[in-house]
């Protein structure tokens, strides 16, 4: 099975869309603040990350951290097979500015990503309600209530983390 971090043939020349600022900062903080990697892995659902390159780089960062907690950027760049991913990861850490309280900023970003994901899903549920059967209505309304309740709580470790 081919790796999914290589663009399909014919798309290799097309530039990758830049991630939005929230996901770019997620990537930056994930790669710079290695002390927060375990916390991030326990609290971030990669499904909340919409940019495929950011999601893949963070996923690879987590995998590398499990294998070698002392691994840094050179090792990460060594396992990223896409040049576009390598450029994005390098760009995220390149400016070298000191970031005040990176752990707090990372928590704020993960909370924001979670809430954006929930808002997007709530909008999807609202659209689905129109044509739903009675059985689907019950499930959708229950999911909507569960998501709304989740937004009232602070970030907690994900199930299984």
Kindly give the residue locations of the regions a language model identified:
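Non-catalytic protein-protein interaction segments used by genome-maintenance enzymes to assemble
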Residues: 1-69, 89-95, 119-122, 153-158
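Bacterial replisome coupling helices
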Residues: 62-161
